[in-house]
A protein has these predicted regions:
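A short, sequence-level motif marking secondary-structure junctions
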Residues: 55-59, 107-109
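Conserved beta-strand in the GNAT
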Residues: 51-53, 102
Length: 143
């Protein structure tokens, strides 16, 4: 029986690719792209990516969200607000196109990237909190 292994990418609809890239660059600085065409851009996250697709036509949706893992939650949220995001609470914002983002710190979640991938992303030495390690340990995924 096959098993899901992870998420390769998430596709997010935005107004224009240029505007969306400017928005994310205001939050994260220069973003690395895997590729770009007229109506698509692919923001690299090491072994995953976010696909931006131009032409959003549906209204804002706060019921569903994208969980974005970062190495600095507080700074990410402050920069998102400064970039024009609408803040929902201490962890969540809505981008200018109505996409709901929940920001979580890498150190506090079970999701783990290999040391080699972290190194390739310029994040070597990024650590997990004791709580996250304990959660992984209960699943047999940490020593």
């Amino acid at each position: 029986m096959p098993r899901p292994v992870g998420i390769n990418h998430v596709a997010v609809e935005v107004g224009s690719i240029d505007d969306a890239l400017r928005f994310f660059e205001e939050i994260f600085g220069e973003v690395e792209l895997r590729g770009r065409s007229g109506s698509m851009a692919f923001i690299d996250l090491g072994d995953q990516f976010i696909a931006l697709s131009a032409g959003r036509s549906q209204p804002a949706d706060e019921a569903r969200h994208i969980g974005l893992v970062v190495d600095g939650r507080e700074e990410t949220l402050a920069r998102a607000k400064a970039a024009g995001a609408r803040m929902l609470d201490d962890n969540d914002f809505v981008d200018p196109w109505g996409n709901h983002w929940q920001v979580v710190d890498y150190r506090d979640i079970q999701f783990t990237k290999t040391p080699r991938i972290l190194e390739g992303m310029g994040l070597a030495g990024l650590e997990k909190s004791d709580r996250a390690i304990a959660e992984l340990r209960t699943k047999g995924l940490a020593d």
